[in-house]
Every structure is written in C-alpha cells, then in structure tokens.
Amino acid sequence: MARYTGPSCRLCRRENMELFLKGERCYTDKCAIKRRNYPPGQHGQGRPKVSNYGVQLREKQKVRRIYGILEKQFRSYFQEADRLKGVTGENLLSLLERRLDNVVYRLGFAASRTEARILVRHNHFTLNGKKANIPSIQLRAGDVVELKEKSRKIACINESLDAVVRRGIPQWLELEKDAYKGVVKTLPVREDITMPIQEQLIVELYSK
C-alpha cells in the first residue's frame, strides 16, 4: 500500500477524530473536524451502518494514520507486540510511541509526526550523541535525543518548542528546552497514551 499524499484533513474527517496531522492548525477553529464533522465525499453526511469487521478495520486505519505507518510495517509492529510479554494491544501502542520520529514530535521539536519524520531523515538530531536519521529507531529508557547545534536557529522548530511548552509533554519524557534535548525517562504505558484508541479492536482484527 502506497503512502497517502492527499489532503491530511480528509483523513481526520474519514476517521471522525482529530489525528493531529497538520500541526498547530489542529488546535485552532480551522480544524476540519470542528468545521465539518462528517466523512468526506458526496454522501459523507449519511454515515452508513458499519459491520464489526468495518469497526475493527477503521480502528486499525486510524492508528496507522496517526503514526504514519504503512500496512506492512504496521503488521510487523503487531507481530512484535504479540511476541512480547504483557497485553498485545498495549505493547503495540508502546512500540509506536517509542519510535524516534514520534518522540521528536512528542518533545515538541516538530509540529506534526510528518514534520518530525522529515527532520530526522535530514540529520537534524543525535541519539545518545550519535547520528540518528532513521525515523523508526526504537528508543529505550535513558535515551537522549538532542537537536544539532547547526539546526537550533530553524524558525519552525523554535515555534514548535514554544507551543509544546504551553501544552505540556507526556510524563514519560523530559524536555530541556534551553539545551534543545529531551530524555526518555521511562517506557510509555497505556495510561500515558491519551488518544481515544481501542487497541483491542486491532488485536481482534489481526487475530482472525
């Protein structure tokens, strides 16, 4: 399945929730969900009855779109989550949260996960003092993500940092804004992920 390149706001309307794909715009009244809270398309306002399979599929698609993951990679994450000890659905969300691009976004260096992925690929960050340009790197407790010196004057990064300071960051992370670095204090648990996700539906879908 190819990566989606169309309007991001259509995805939010399709999933009937804010996926925070457009950065700061998602926190304003310009958000598509706030303006048109129904699916895109000619018949979008007449939401049809959805089967159990359809509900499970939509939940999986929603999580994939939140984190910007293609189907093949998402299935690999699920298989790894299923092998780990604990609850499979919670393991899945923890693995997704611990991606380098997501941590960069959560720390406030980027306004969206898409922007964070681009910044990582363009070598703007180090991980524990070493070059890190692979968005899918899994972070562990104690890892330090730091913005390179040459990148600290980029306007969009500083604007994002100012915005996240006002909103706050997850408890499992720590941001040292003046030093342009963040630390993974602990691994994320289910209570740290506040998005309205029903991960058990994804487990049921892949268990068929």
UniProtKB/Swiss-Prot annotation:
GO molecular function: rRNA binding; structural constituent of ribosome
Cysteines engaged in disulfide bonds, as pairs: none
Pfam family, one: Ribosomal_S4
One Gene Ontology biological process: ribosomal small subunit biogenesis
Ribosomal protein listed as a keyword: yes
Quaternary data: Part of the 30S ribosomal subunit. Contacts protein S5. The interaction surface between S4 and S5 is involved in control of translational fidelity.
Function: One of the primary rRNA binding proteins, it binds directly to 16S rRNA where it nucleates assembly of the body of the 30S subunit.
HAMAP family: Ribosomal_uS4_B
Protein name: Small ribosomal subunit protein uS4
Gene behind the chain: rpsD
